[in-house]
Swiss-Prot record:
GO terms for cellular component: membrane. Keywords: Membrane, Transmembrane, Transmembrane helix. The chain crosses the membrane at residues 5-25, 35-55. This is Transmembrane protein 300R. It is a multi-pass membrane protein. It is found in: Membrane.
Length: 61
């Protein structure tokens, strides 16, 4: 995988994490699809890991 693709993937992961955070901050009753909670939690975790990766990656350059 080329570095540019990896960077793009990481940025998309961060965006997914942001969406996940918005989803998880809405009250449980108001959520459009309760089965998405698991995936949204996963996307938040992935987003945080992606942010850490991007910060470490750009320090080296």
């Amino acid at each position: 995988m080329k570095k540019e693709f990896l960077d793009l993937y990481m940025i998309l992961s961060v965006l997914a994490g942001v969406i996940g955070i918005f989803y998880l901050t809405t009250p449980y009753q108001d959520r459009p699809d309760k089965s998405l909670s698991y995936y949204m939690t996963l996307s938040v975790v992935t987003g945080i890991l992606a942010l850490i990766y991007l910060q470490n990656h750009h320090k080296k350059n």
